Design a protein with these regions (language model features):
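Active-site-proximal substrate-binding groove within the catalytic cores of carbohydrate-active enzymes
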Residues: 97-102, 107-153, 212, 306-319, ...
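Aromatic-lined carbohydrate-binding/catalytic grooves of carbohydrate-active enzymes
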Residues: 187-340, 352, 361-372
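Carbohydrate-recognition beta-sandwich/jelly-roll modules
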Residues: 1-240, 284, 490-493
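Structural alpha-beta junctions
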Residues: 36, 51-54, 234-237, 280-282, ...
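Short acidic, gly/pro-rich beta-turn/loop elements at beta-sheet edges
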Residues: 38-40, 52, 251, 295-297, ...
């Protein structure tokens, strides 16, 4: 079996490695000590998952939250190649028509990509491990589990069993039995209310007190209480509310600054009244936070805690949002400088349940090259998992979006597993499949995709997909707040009038 080293300077080297037999099939790997310096990426066992046009079977390819998981059948098609640089599930599969194999990545998981390729009728699927010229932080290792069952659900079942036995996951029912806060939340529908925000994307890249755009109030704390009352009148028993934009200057207003509570919504006094009221109605209530980005308009902004590149520059994020230009926070410094105190302060307001931390399981894990707090991707994953474990301890649960499964053992709910389930398919996509759902149903709660939130007001296809793929009901007020970016669907829930709450 072959591996290929592609170096930063353009050199390419190939070598053979020997597989090691195991009860489940075999495993193969490369010790980190045997990986030379200066490697850009490693193409691993590129000669193993191979087929020819006309063969029976398929490739199973988890591409990431943008595209979900696809099947590629071995039919005649033009030459093409696709590189998925961010793979949110740590596996990939091959069915020959007679047997199936799933590769489970157990070493260098956080630096995993997948390459799909067709050239002159020959199909290839292999993992690519990104080293970026740095030393490998751990061994590259992949286990190959074989089965005579050729259905993709069998491969999902193998990965599910692996995650439950070796991946640290436990069933939701077991966790809920051990923590009444999680039990209460897991029994409830999720209701997400976007309360306040500045224009997004912001017309002002670098904001300060003089040029900061005004906050738009979408739902005051008093009005949120009226939404809770309306739910109670309809005899809805189990709900967990999540407030987005409760913090100073609203959604993504001045992160990592949270306080004071946004005054235009009613401030801290009205927020505490709301929390007490909602809990008095028998409902849960949590809030939306962030642990990855810093806006220069924050009163605590400091380049000290930002991610540094190899060139010692700070790492700006590509998405311009309500607070203007965000910069990536070093995961270690986020935990040390902000999360412990922030969660304590948020809990003191009264929030309890499945706490939401934005984007933590949908973004590629950053490397930090600051000599005072350097972090490779494996270390970054551990710092983020510390945040998740702290969230569970303080509030009762942790949630984010998309479900990048380096964090599967510490995640209770994901807002959506990927974006659209059905969209224009590319040359290598023949079918979308619910791999995340088959693996994690009953372990992690989820909404199937962005287009199945608010499913009662969506079209028939979205409603059916919601039930078929086993979602946690999710209602979102003011989902479409960003100009021209209705990525949660065109349909929305509004709260301006009493009629809209009926």
């Amino acid at each position: 079996m072959k591996v290929r080293y592609v170096y930063e300077d353009g050199r390419i080297a190939e070598r053979e490695i020997e597989p090691v037999k195991a009860e489940y099939g075999f495993w193969a790997g490369i010790s980190s000590e045997n990986l030379p310096s200066g490697i850009k990426h490693v193409d691993f066992l590129y000669d193993y998952f191979c087929a020819n046009a006309g063969d029976d079977g398929y490739f199973l390819v988890p591409r990431g939250p943008e595209d979900g998981t696809v099947l590629t059948y071995f039919k005649e098609r033009e030459n093409c190649e696709r590189e998925s640089t961010f793979v949110h599930l740590g596996c990939y599969g091959f069915c020959s028509g007679k047997e199936s194999v799933i590769g489970i990545v157990t070493g260098m998981r956080c630096s995993l990509g997948l390459i799909e390729r067709v050239y002159n009728g020959k199909y290839e699927l292999f993992p690519r491990f990104y080293l970026d010229g740095d030393a490998a932080e751990e061994d590259i290792r992949v286990e190959f589990h074989k089965t005579e069952n050729t259905d993709y659900s069998a491969l999902a079942g193998i990965y599910r069993e692996y995650q439950l036995t070796a991946g640290g996951c436990t069933p939701l029912s077991q966790r809920a039995a051990e923590d009444p806060r999680l039990k209460k939340a897991s029994d409830g529908i999720s209701v997400r209310i976007r309360t306040a925000w500045k224009p997004a994307p912001s017309p002002v890249l670098f904001q300060n007190e003089e040029n900061e755009p005004d906050v738009k109030v979408g739902c005051s704390f008093e009005r949120a209480g009226e939404i809770a009352d309306a739910c109670k009148r309809e005899n809805i028993e189990n709900l967990e509310f999540c407030l987005v934009g409760w913090n100073y200057k609203g959604h993504d207003g001045r992160f990592p600054q949270l306080f004071p509570v946004e005054p235009t919504l009613g401030g801290e006094t009205e927020l505490k009244k709301l929390i007490t009221k909602v809990q008095g109605l028998g409902y849960g209530i949590v809030c939306h936070d962030d642990a990855t980005q810093a806006y220069p308009c924050a009163d605590c902004f400091d380049e000290e805690y930002l991610v540094k590149t190899k060139g010692a520059t700070v790492l700006a994020q590509p998405q311009i949002w309500s607070g203007g230009q965000p910069f990536k926070i070093c995961p270690q410094r986020e935990y040390e400088r902000f999360e412990i105190e922030n969660m304590k302060a948020i809990r003191a307001l009264g929030f309890e349940g499945i706490h939401y931390v934005d984007v933590l399981t949908i973004v590629q894990l950053p490397k930090c090259y600051d000599p005072h707090h350097s972090s490779n991707r494996t270390q970054t994953a551990e710092w983020y998992r510390k945040i998740m474990k702290l969230s569970r301890k303080v509030f009762g649960g942790f949630s984010s979006e998309a479900g990048f499964d380096y964090a599967a053992a510490f995640t209770d709910y994901v807002l959506y597993t990927n974006f659209k389930i059905e969209k224009e398919r590319d040359l290598l996509c023949d079918e979308y499949i619910p791999l995340f759902q088959l693996v994690y149903h009953g372990i992690i709660m989820y909404n199937p995709c962005t287009y199945t939130l608010n499913y009662p007001v969506k079209g028939a296809q979205q409603r059916l997909k919601f039930f078929e793929w086993g979602g946690r009901p999710l209602a979102v007020f003011n989902a479409n707040f960003a100009d021209g970016q209705h990525w949660m669907g065109e349909e929305d829930l509004f709260n301006e009038t009493d009629e809209q709450l009926k």
